[in-house]
Each structure stands twice: as C-alpha cells, then as structure tokens.
C-alpha cells in the first residue's frame, strides 16, 4: 500500500489533506514539520499550507528526500523559494473561487483536469518565478503560476486547496499524486 505523509505547516485545512488521502485508501500519517527528515518512511510527502514561511520547520529538508513531493499553497511557495524560484505578494489576496486553466494535459498531477477547473485558492502570497527545472502547468486571471511541476524530480505544487469541498476536482489531484507515489 502506498504511504504518504502530510506535513503540518500549521494550515487550517491540513487535517482535510490527511483525510482526503485516507479516504482514497492511502496509508497516511499527519506529521509535525519538526519531524527529522531521516525519520520519514514514506512513498511521498504532502507539504501542507500554512500561515507563513516563519513556521515551516524542517519542510525545506524534506525536499532533499528521494520521494515525490506535493506542495499545497504555502507548500508550493516554500518549494519554489527553496529551489531557486521567487515568491511574492499576490495581487488578489485572500480566498476566492477561481477558474484555473490547465496548460499541460500530459502533466501527471493536474493534466487530467484540462482544459480548466474551478478551485478554492488563497493568493496572499504566490510563486512569481519558477525554479529551474519546473514548468508552469496552470494559470488563472488572478495568479500567473497556479501550479508547477518538475516531473524529473517528482516535485509538484498547486496554489489552490484540493482538499476543500469548493475545489471541484480536488480528489482527482490526490488520486493522481497517489499514483505518482505508487509509480503508476
């Protein structure tokens, strides 16, 4: 059975990420972000959202593990910042119902959502510049980089929250990540 840990970066929806994976039959565990990387035994990691970069614990070190990583909201932002991209204030700010255009139908994480999907997103901060090796896989009218992927390193990020009911295909994002982690 595929095992995916959800790293708690103190976001308000982290428990929903854990539940979404559990409901898909994934062996999942919610771990605190101060868990030493060498203690993680998993096929994949979800870096949850959270309030700010000052409370990300060991999350940057988890990017060095040789397993797939999905960053959600702050998780995507910290991935971008740690790997050489740039994060800045969003023009929109706050939570909103957003229509996202999928740019890469072959992307293993979100390509199946093409041509577009409606999501619940927060854009107080966002990725402004991609790290080397990443491709922009989704965009919207309020955020230029709604999702990013580096399929060579199995690193994926979404600005939105697939774990909340307002995101129409959120479960599919978690299914796709489960399949990535299982090597399917």
UniProtKB/Swiss-Prot annotation:
GO cellular component: cytosol
Domain of life: Archaea
PROSITE patterns named among the record's database cross-references: GATASE_TYPE_1
Catalytic activity: XMP + L-glutamine + ATP + H2O = GMP + L-glutamate + AMP + diphosphate + 2 H(+)
Keyword Ligase: yes
CDD domains: GATase1_GMP_Synthase
Domain Glutamine amidotransferase type-1 span(s) in chain numbering: 3-184
InterPro entries: Class_I_gatase-like, GATASE, GMP_synth_GATase, GMP_synthase_A
GO molecular function: ATP binding; GMP synthase activity
Active site: 73, 161, 163
Pfam families, alphabetized: GATase (PF00117)
Keywords: ATP-binding, Glutamine amidotransferase, GMP biosynthesis, Ligase, Nucleotide-binding, Purine biosynthesis
Assigned EC number: 6.3.5.2
Pathway: Purine metabolism; GMP biosynthesis; GMP from XMP (L-Gln route): step 1/1
Free-text function comment from the UniProt entry: Catalyzes the synthesis of GMP from XMP.
Subunit relationships: Heterodimer composed of a glutamine amidotransferase subunit (A) and a GMP-binding subunit (B).
The name this protein goes by in its record: GMP synthase [glutamine-hydrolyzing] subunit A
Organism: Natronomonas pharaonis (strain ATCC 35678 / DSM 2160 / CIP 103997 / JCM 8858 / NBRC 14720 / NCIMB 2260 / Gabara)
